[in-house]
Design a protein with these regions (language model features):
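Membrane-helix interface segments in multi-pass membrane proteins
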Residues: 77-106, 204-235, 239, 289, ...
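Juxtamembrane inter-helical linkers in multi-pass membrane proteins
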Residues: 43-57, 121-139, 169-191, 244-266, ...
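Hydrophobic alpha-helical transmembrane segments of multi-pass integral membrane proteins
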Residues: 23, 63-82, 102-113, 147-155, ...
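Membrane-water interface of transmembrane alpha-helices
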Residues: 31-44, 109-121, 159-175, 236-248
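Membrane-water interface at loop-to-transmembrane-helix junctions
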Residues: 140-142, 146-147, 183-199, 262-272, ...
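Membrane-interface helix-loop-helix junctions at boundaries between adjacent transmembrane segments
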Residues: 89-98, 118-147
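Intrinsically disordered cytosolic tails
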Residues: 229-336
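Hydrophobic, aromatic-rich membrane-embedded alpha-helical segments
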Residues: 18-38, 145-166, 271-291
Length: 336
């Protein structure tokens, strides 16, 4: 069994972040892309698996170029449609059409960004000198994405766990390390129970809170406090179940990944992070980042027989537009 580990320090990350913020302010935001690449390079270099560390090869210039391409492909059309609605006196039917077109552009942005950002980040990541790659086609993911949301709406949310596992299967099974690919064996039925429990609990709590407010049974503030204190742990539990299920059903060769994430561990991580951020007014962000990295790498292992030394490099070309798409609306499509 081989495990992951993280060796970074919050103090080092804080020093880097202070310099990055200062340079970003001086350059009126232009340094943001170089700062992002610098932080990633540090985090990857401090992440190890089976004793060997990862490396990040992306550059600020590539991220900046990707951002410009994303602006041309999605940003300009989206903001142009918004500007037309705001500044032109248009008939109601035309205004509605522009709103629909803007929504479509935004809807298309998400799957395109997911695929292309993953493609870029994989090809800019290496381990033992061998790079990862992602070979899924954007058009195939678009079909999956449209179908998933359509069926989810038609089934009143019941199809959502199946959509999520199909999405994960696409991303994992099209990811390669050198010349060998990862595989995903999960199925939507495996997440149906956690999803149903979370959804039912959410509806029940919201209905009870709404009823209490309508009948003035309790103080409004106390009633609303019930929502985060009850639903927060439930949704953290669902997140943990999803992460564990995804990794437990991911294979590489004859070996299978395994995650030791539990609700208790994940809740402790998030509560500790929240306390650190509140007590330091956000200054503990570097330590929160280190805590997260150490937690998620430490709970992941690869079990079974696999000869990693036999993996060969397989070079593929990639585009940085996906990275720019993620920066464009700040949705943060990082590696799952």
């Amino acid at each position: 069994m081989q495990r992951g580990s993280f060796h970074g320090a919050g103090g080092t990350l804080l020093g880097m972040q202070i310099v990055n913020v200062c340079l970003t302010i001086v350059t009126l935001g232009a340094y943001h892309f170089w700062a992002k690449a610098k932080i990633r390079r540090y985090l990857f270099s401090q992440t190890a698996f089976a004793g060997d560390r990862f490396a990040y090869h992306g550059t600020g210039k590539e991220l900046y170029q990707g951002f410009l391409k994303a602006m041309v492909v999605f940003g300009i059309p989206y903001f142009s449609l918004g500007a037309a609605q705001s500044f032109l006196a248009l008939p109601q039917s035309v205004d509605f059409l522009l709103q629909a077109m803007a929504a479509l552009v935004l809807f298309l942005y998400v799957p395109v960004a997911i695929v292309n950002a993953r493609r870029y980040r994989c090809t800019r990541t290496s381990w033992r000198g061998i790079r990862f790659s992602f070979r899924g086609r954007t058009v195939d993911f678009l079909k999956l994405y449209f179908k998933g949301w359509l069926f989810t709406l038609l089934t009143l949310g019941t199809y959502y766990p199946y959509f999520q596992t199909q999405r994960q299967a696409f991303l994992h099974s099209h990811t390669y390390f050198g010349n060998q690919r990862f595989q995903f064996t999960g199925h939507g039925s495996g997440l149906m129970v956690p999803f149903a429990v979370t959804l039912f609990t959410t509806y029940a709590v919201l209905c009870l809170c709404g009823l209490a407010l309508a009948l003035q049974l309790t103080n409004a503030g106390l009633t609303l406090l019930l929502i985060p204190f009850v639903l927060g742990p439930v949704w953290v539990w669902l997140l943990g179940q999803k992460q564990k299920y995804y990794w437990d059903h991911t294979t590489f060769g004859e070996a299978r990944f395994s995650s030791s994430i539990t609700w208790q561990k994940l809740s402790g991580l998030y509560l500790g992070n929240l306390a650190l951020l509140l007590l330091t007014l956000g200054w503990a962000w570097p330590w929160v980042t280190v805590r997260n990295a150490r937690f998620f790498t430490g709970t992941l292992s690869l079990q079974g027989v696999t000869d990693l030394d036999r993996v060969l490099q397989d070079t593929t070309e990639t585009s940085v537009t996906g990275e720019g798409l993620s920066n464009l609306l700040d949705t943060g499509f990082d590696m799952d």
